[in-house]
């Protein structure tokens, strides 16, 4: 028991939770659920790998959808993650990147990570569930 006690103490105090740094510019994003049917012509671009679509009615400044590989769809908040909300703090899709209108910072639609230097926060990710041609964004 004497040998087991130090091991237990090390395990208990050695385990720390992951530290998640909250983006101070985008901490109160609206919650939503939106279902789309890829059979409809409006969403046809999302049926193929590399396809993108921006839904301006969702999220804070809109939601960018990106078809990663023909089956997996990713969803990102369209707000610039390193800017206070303003008239120009929206990202615009350019291929597989999102570019901030305010400072021209570039973000990957594949990972959400910034591609520009000296940028602290990446794009905010939304959940996506796909069942056949029905896609739920939340």
PLM regions: where:
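Sec-dependent signal peptide recognition
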Residues: 1-7
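C-terminal motif of bacterial Sec signal peptides marking the signal peptidase cleavage site
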Residues: 11-14
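N-proximal short alpha-helices
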Residues: 16-19, 101
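N-terminal pre-ligand scaffold of iron-sulfur
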Residues: 18-95, 108-109, 124-138
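Short cysteine/histidine-rich metal-coordination sites, predominantly Zn2+-binding motifs
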Residues: 94-104, 114-124
């Amino acid at each position: 028991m004497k040998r087991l006690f130090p091991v237990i103490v090390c395990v208990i105090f050695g385990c720390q939770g992951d530290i998640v740094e909250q983006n101070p510019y985008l901490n109160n994003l609206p919650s939503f659920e939106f279902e789309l049917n890829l059979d409809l012509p409006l969403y046809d671009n999302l049926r193929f790998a590399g396809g993108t679509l921006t839904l301006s009615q969702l999220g804070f400044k809109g939601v960018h959808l990106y078809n990663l590989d023909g089956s997996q769809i990713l969803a990102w908040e369209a707000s610039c993650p390193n800017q206070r909300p303003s008239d120009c703090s929206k990202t615009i899709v350019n291929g597989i990147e999102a570019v901030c209108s305010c400072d021209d910072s570039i973000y990957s639609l594949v990972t959400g990570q910034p591609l520009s230097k000296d940028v602290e926060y990446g794009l905010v990710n939304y959940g996506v569930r796909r069942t056949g041609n029905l896609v739920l964004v939340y």
